């Protein structure tokens, strides 16, 4: 699964880790995160994330 990076603050969403503090279980692909999820560091929406080149 591909990682995604926040273009505002640089936070990297790693599907292997998820975002359990905000209700996203490990193993959840970026596409399957709810549309109302926001970056846990800066609060922007999913539309401010791009696929990581890593």
From Swiss-Prot:
Biological processes, Gene Ontology terms: alkane catabolic process; oxygen metabolic process; response to toxic substance
Q: Which InterPro entries match?
A: Rubredoxin (IPR024922), Rubredoxin-like_dom (IPR024934), Rubredoxin_dom (IPR024935), Rubredoxin_ET (IPR050526), Rubredoxin_Fe_BS (IPR018527)
Per the UniProt entry, the Enzyme Commission number(s) are 1.-.-.-
Induction of expression:
Up-regulated upon exposure to O(2). Repressed by PerR.
Q: How is the cofactor bound?
A: Binds 1 Fe(3+) ion per subunit.
**One GO molecular-function entry:** iron ion binding
The coenzyme or cofactor needed here is: Fe(3+)
Entry keyword set: Detoxification, Electron transport, Iron, Metal-binding, Oxidoreductase, Stress response, Transport
Where would I find the Rubredoxin-like domain in this sequence? 1-54
- Gene3D superfamilies, per the entry: 2.20.28.10
Q: Main EC class of this protein?
A: oxidoreductase
**Where is Fe cation annotated to bind?**
6, 9, 39, 42
What positions belong to coiled-coil segments?
none
Explain the purpose of this protein: Rubredoxin is a small nonheme, iron protein lacking acid-labile sulfide. Its single Fe, chelated to 4 Cys, functions as an electron acceptor and may also stabilize the conformation of the molecule. Functions as an intermediate component in the electron transfer chain: NADH->NROR->Rd->FprA1/2 in which Rd serves as the proximal electron donor to the FDPs that exhibit H(2)O-forming NADH oxidase activity. Also functions as the proximal electron donor to the Dfx and revRbr proteins that display superoxide reductase (SOR) and NADH peroxidase activity, respectively.
Concerning NCBIfam families, the annotation shows: RubredRD
> Of which family is this protein a member?
Belongs to the rubredoxin family.
Query: Which protein is depicted?
Result: Rubredoxin
Source organism: Clostridium acetobutylicum (strain ATCC 824 / DSM 792 / JCM 1419 / IAM 19013 / LMG 5710 / NBRC 13948 / NRRL B-527 / VKM B-1787 / 2291 / W)
At the highest ranks, the source species' classification is:
Bacteria, Bacillati, Bacillota, Clostridia, Eubacteriales
């Amino acid at each position: 699964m591909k990682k995604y990076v926040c273009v505002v603050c640089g936070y990297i969403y790693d599907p292997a880790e998820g975002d359990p503090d905000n209700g996203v279980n490990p193993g959840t692909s970026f596409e399957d995160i709810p549309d109302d999820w926001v970056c846990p560091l800066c609060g922007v929406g999913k539309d401010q994330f791009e696929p990581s080149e890593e």
